[in-house]
């Protein structure tokens, strides 16, 4: 969950979670909330308790990838968890003009750094072992790409179901759907945490006219400490605020889901200042009546993430086409004479 040098603990939780926020417990809760939004026929197969438990567990998976500390994985995984929207102006971009393809953004960054090196502070190689300091994060691309992966999973699942896939093939396709659902939930959850959308991700940096905290423990407090202080996450209570999943209207457009992901992140970025203000006003201490007032804000962010995630899952199911290549393969296989080996 944390950006760059921050780390996370991943521990098991139950329905009423007693530790963490957007630590493992928060991501577990967000995936549970998203599951609560789905219709009974979602996916064309039964989301059994075992499947649901796996979806919830996988909400913490991208943070578990930090456990080995290998630089190639850190380089690949770390920037997917955030985007510093303030950096866009350095590249002549706005949220509305972000390119659909992540590596087009990398090219934009590289061109601007070569053309205008004076705009960018020097990078200390000792603090850039994973070579991510030149990047501003890929969170909306990660969300979009996982949506497309889920569409692909549903595509071949539908085709196996309709054109005579074996029970083993169908079961494996269902398991793949569950895996991608769970993992992508992590990134949608990160998008609801305002500190994952900003350069002020762990204490205010630079000009600070409002006197906001500069504590290097602030991110950790919002991710987990405050919820531990205030009794944990009650998923059952928050689920009452979730409405049935809805199809994302523009998802059928080539850049529709990406633009929706960007808009979702921009809306959370607008809450960076209010979040810091809650801290300054003493509403995030977790002590006394005043210190509990920030709980409504953070609970609301979990609900936003769960709702967005449910809508994305539902849309992927509805938008997924049948896999035409697989259809032909299955039809040919099933038309083969008895005794012919099926491949």
Could you describe each region identified by the protein language model?
Residues 16-18:
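N-terminal signal peptide c-region/cleavage motif recognized by signal peptidases
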Residues 10-13:
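Hydrophobic helical h-region of N-terminal Sec-dependent signal peptides
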Residues 20-179, 183, 194-310, 314-343:
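N-terminal, motif-rich segments that launch catalysis or mediate targeting to/interaction with membranes
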Residues 1-7:
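Bacterial N-terminal signal peptides that target proteins for export
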């Amino acid at each position: 969950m944390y950006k760059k040098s921050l780390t996370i603990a991943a521990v098991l939780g139950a329905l009423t979670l007693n530790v963490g926020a957007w630590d493992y417990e928060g991501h577990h809760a967000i995936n549970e909330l998203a599951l609560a939004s789905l219709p009974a026929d979602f996916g064309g197969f039964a989301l059994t308790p075992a499947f649901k438990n796996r979806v919830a567990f996988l909400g913490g998976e991208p943070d578990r990838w930090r456990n080995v500390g290998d630089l190639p994985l850190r380089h690949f995984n770390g920037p997917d968890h955030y985007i510093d929207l303030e950096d866009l102006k350095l590249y002549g971009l706005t949220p509305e003009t972000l390119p659909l393809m992540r590596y087009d953004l990398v090219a934009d960054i590289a061109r601007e750094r070569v053309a205008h090196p004076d705009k960018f502070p020097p990078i200390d190689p000792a603090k850039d072992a994973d070579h991510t300091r030149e990047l501003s994060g890929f969170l909306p691309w990660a969300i979009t790409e996982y949506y497309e992966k889920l569409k692909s999973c549903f595509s071949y699942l539908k085709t196996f179901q309709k054109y005579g896939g074996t029970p083993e093939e169908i079961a494996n396709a269902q398991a793949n759907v569950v895996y991608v659902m769970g993992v992508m939930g992590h990134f949608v959850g990160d998008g609801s945490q305002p500190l994952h959308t900003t350069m002020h991700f762990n204490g205010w940096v630079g000009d600070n006219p409002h006197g906001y905290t500069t504590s290097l423990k602030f991110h950790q407090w919002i991710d987990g400490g405050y919820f531990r202080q205030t009794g944990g996450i009650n998923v059952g209570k928050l689920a009452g605020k979730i409405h049935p999943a809805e199809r994302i209207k523009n998802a059928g457009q080539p850049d529709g889901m990406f633009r929706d992901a960007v808009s979702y992140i921009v809306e959370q970025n607008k809450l960076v200042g209010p979040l810091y203000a809650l801290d300054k006003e003493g509403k995030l201490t977790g002590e006394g009546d005043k210190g509990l007032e920030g709980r409504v804000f953070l609970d609301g962010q979990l609900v936003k993430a769960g709702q967005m995630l449910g809508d994305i899952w539902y849309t992927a199911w509805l938008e997924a086409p049948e896999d035409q290549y697989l259809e032909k393969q299955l039809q040919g296989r099933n038309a083969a004479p008895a005794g012919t080996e099926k491949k």
